[in-house]
C-alpha cells in the first residue's frame, strides 16, 4: 500500500526535477572555487518539493497507521514485522512464549540435551519443536520441586501412517528395527538422570505385530537399568489386535497412554484411515479390563480442528466410560504448510472449563491448557497425583488410630 501512494506522490516531483535538469546545461552548472561541480540542483529540487508535498498532505496516509497495513483493531505497537500470509491470523498473546532460561539456571535441561547429542537419541521434544521443552527437561530447576521429563521415540523416525496433523515423516517401507535400540535407550535414559520418561513410538503397520514385541523389549531394558524410574508408554493401536495390546500392557510400565486425538466426527479427516475413534476407545477399555484397573491409562485431545463444545464433552465422557484415568487437552498448532490448518484458537478460559469438567467426571487428573501436549510435564502431574492418592488412603487410618483405646499401663 505504501508503495502505491508514495509512487503517485513522487511522480509529479520527479517530472518537475527532470524539467529542471533539462533547463541547466552541463556547461553552465554552478561550480565552487576549486572548479568541482556543486551538488546537482535536481536532488535539491526533488527533496524540496517532496518535503513540501508531504507537509501539505491531507489524506491521512502520511502516518504510521497509513504506512502499516494493520489488521483491524490491532495497535501499531503490536504490528508484525513483514507481511502476513493471506488467510493466516497472528497468534493470540497466550500462545507467545518467553525464551527459555540459560544454561546457568537450567542445569537439568542442559544435561539432558548434552546426553541426547552424545547418544544420538531422538526425542519427540526436539523433533516436534515442542514449546514446553524447557519446562519438561528443566523439571522445575528454578523452584527445585519439579520432575524432569523427556519423551523418546523408538522404532525409527518414519511412520507408516499419514495423520494430517502430525509432522513425523511417513514411509510405506521404513528401515528395519534396530535390535540394539533397547540397550541404547536404557543406557541413554540412565545418563539423562530424569525421574520420568515417556516412550512413544511410530506406527509400524509393515510389521506383523506392529512393533509390540520391540516396545516390550525397550520398556523392559529401561526398567531393568533404571528400577526407580517411572515409565509411560505412549503407543499406537496395534491394528486393534487386543492380544498385542495385552502384551504391551503386561510389560513393567507405569502408565499406558494412547491418544484419541480429536472428537469422533472429525476423526476421518484428521487421523489416518487405519485409525478410528472407536478402535482407540476399545484399546483403552481393554487395557483397563485386562489389568483390572491397576494400570493408569491416559489419553489426549486436541482443540482447534473444527470440534464443537458438546463433542468435546462427549469425548471426555467416552474416555471416562472406557476407564481412562488421566487426560490432557491442548491447542492444535499447524506444524507445516502441508498439515491441517488451525480452525480456531481456544481461549485459556475454555481450557480451564474443560479441566474442571474432566475432574468432575472422575478423572484422577487433567492437564488442560493452550500449550499442553500429551506428555506435558507428565512426571510432575503423575507424582502429584500419586501423593494425593496416598494422602487420601492414609487419612482414614490416622483417624481410626486416634479413636482406638490406649493400653492400660
UniProtKB/Swiss-Prot annotation:
Protein name: Lipoyl synthase, mitochondrial
Extra remark: This protein may be expected to contain an N-terminal transit peptide but none has been predicted.
Catalytic activity: [[Fe-S] cluster scaffold protein carrying a second [4Fe-4S](2+) cluster] + N(6)-octanoyl-L-lysyl-[protein] + 2 oxidized [2Fe-2S]-[ferredoxin] + 2 S-adenosyl-L-methionine + 4 H(+) = [[Fe-S] cluster scaffold protein] + N(6)-[(R)-dihydrolipoyl]-L-lysyl-[protein] + 4 Fe(3+) + 2 hydrogen sulfide + 2 5'-deoxyadenosine + 2 L-methionine + 2 reduced [2Fe-2S]-[ferredoxin]
Pathway the protein contributes to: Protein modification; protein lipoylation via endogenous pathway; protein N(6)-(lipoyl)lysine from octanoyl-[acyl-carrier-protein]: step 2/2
GO molecular function, one term: 4 iron, 4 sulfur cluster binding
Cofactor note: Binds 2 [4Fe-4S] clusters per subunit. One cluster is coordinated with 3 cysteines and an exchangeable S-adenosyl-L-methionine.
Residues covered by region (Disordered): 21-41
Domain Radical SAM core: start-end pairs: 142-364
